[in-house]
């Protein structure tokens, strides 16, 4: 009996070693984030240790950088240069350096033109193509603390949106895992490329959501792999099929009605853009436009726009191209901005009987003033009034939603949270054929 138990124990040990050796590896905790949002073309960078102690590795040497230490990195015209604290500037023998944390700390990074952004973790810098490439090496969960509050808002936790923040944390983590693998690939901090990441200074209530969902990601029912967890600000009341935006079919991101995104989101819920027929035409190399025709997807989003001028010349462009011509890049979002491809259009003639007493068309929704521009003098709501009247009319674009509309609508998630849905129910509504998993 003793011999049998011995062999049984030995067999169990061998089996356990086999299971451990063949288990799926967990995702790496440290990730690399290339800081391109504000530092993409930085020729001069200032770094300061704001908390903790760091080690500077430079030109095959190392030195300690206690809290308060400061570095300036630039270009001398023939080689990169560095200044450490108040020492003299010196030429770098190697065009790269690392700043590694000895203990838990923070680093402030800025260019002469921008305010400072503070990051956890380490920094690796290298001079490439006439600018400094700056990479933040940081724990993945700390990274998410700098993503969720800027992709959504810390204030949503107070307004009943705590579950929406959890849903955002899971979506952002899933996006991270899918795009970095086990940490071998870098991700950027840019919302135009990957996800918005703004470091320590934006951290707040959203960190609770990150902690509450730690390591949770969305995986596909069939493949068991992380999904493409796409999201945008506001779906306009109908999510879009991934194929119609990115060109590839995706069973996890399909088009469906989204009642939770209706009547929420301020300017994103309903926006209006006005442009004169001459300005619209000149934008696309045509004369004053007489007709605009829209080709749409089943969701109602515009697929392409056909523009025809008064001379019979026409041009057809994709909705994305059309929107980019008028999108308010770098400007505050407002209700008189062109925010997406979910829109209708109509033409209004510049007829005097359409004017309000103040001179501003009352039906356009503008705030009344004692003196206002005539409809014929409106060039566009982006440019404002013109000093010269034109008789060709204006086009009004009434739209809803903000962003591509694929996957989770952030405003819709917020509304669902306010209505009592939990983050798992929110994710289930927006992402098809998925389940939550911890790698």
Name each region found by the language model.
Residues 2-439:
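Conserved, single-site charged/polar hotspot
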């Amino acid at each position: 009996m003793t011999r049998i138990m011995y062999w049984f124990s030995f067999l169990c040990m061998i089996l356990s070693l086999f299971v451990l050796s063949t288990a799926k590896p967990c995702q790496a905790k440290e990730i690399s984030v290339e800081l391109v949002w504000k530092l993409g073309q930085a020729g001069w960078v200032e770094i300061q240790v704001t908390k903790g102690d760091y080690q500077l590795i430079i030109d095959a040497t190392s030195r300690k950088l206690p809290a308060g230490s400061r570095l300036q990195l630039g270009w001398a015209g023939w080689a990169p240069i560095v200044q450490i604290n108040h020492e003299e500037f010196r030429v770098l023998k190697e065009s790269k350096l690392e700043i590694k944390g000895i203990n838990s700390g923070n680093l402030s990074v800025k260019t002469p033109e921008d305010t400072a952004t503070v990051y956890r973790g380490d920094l690796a810098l290298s001079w490439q193509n006439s600018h400094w490439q700056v990479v933040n090496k940081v724990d993945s969960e700390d990274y998410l603390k700098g993503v969720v509050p800027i992709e959504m808002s810390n204030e949503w936790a107070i307004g009943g949106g705590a579950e929406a923040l959890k849903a955002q944390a899971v979506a952002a983590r899933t996006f991270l895992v899918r795009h970095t693998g086990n940490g071998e690939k870098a991700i950027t901090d840019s919302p135009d490329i990957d996800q918005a990441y703004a470091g320590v200074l934006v951290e707040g209530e959203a960190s609770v959501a990150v902690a509450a969902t730690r390591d949770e990601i969305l995986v596909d029912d069939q493949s068991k792999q992380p999904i493409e967890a796409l999201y945008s600000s506001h779906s306009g009341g109908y999510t879009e099929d991934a194929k119609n935006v990115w060109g590839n079919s995706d069973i996890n991101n399909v088009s469906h009605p989204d009642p939770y995104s209706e009547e929420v989101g301020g300017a994103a819920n309903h926006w209006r853009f006005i442009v004169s027929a001459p300005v619209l035409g000149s934008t696309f190399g045509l004369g004053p436009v007489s007709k605009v025709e829209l080709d749409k997807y089943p969701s109602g989003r515009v697929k392409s726009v056909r523009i025809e001028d008064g001379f019979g010349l026409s041009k057809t462009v994709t909705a994305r191209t059309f929107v980019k011509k008028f999108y308010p890049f770098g400007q505050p979002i407002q209700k008189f901005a062109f925010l997406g491809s979910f829109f209708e259009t109509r033409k209004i003639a510049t007829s005097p009987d359409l004017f309000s007493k103040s001179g501003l068309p009352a039906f356009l929704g503008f705030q009344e003033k004692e003196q206002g521009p005539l409809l014929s003098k409106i060039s566009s709501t982006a440019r404002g009034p013109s000093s010269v009247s034109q008789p060709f009319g204006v086009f009004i674009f009434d739209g809803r939603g903000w962003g591509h509309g694929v996957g989770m609508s952030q405003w819709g998630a917020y509304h669902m949270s306010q209505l009592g849905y939990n983050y798992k129910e929110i994710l289930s509504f927006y992402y098809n054929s998925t389940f939550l998993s911890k790698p």
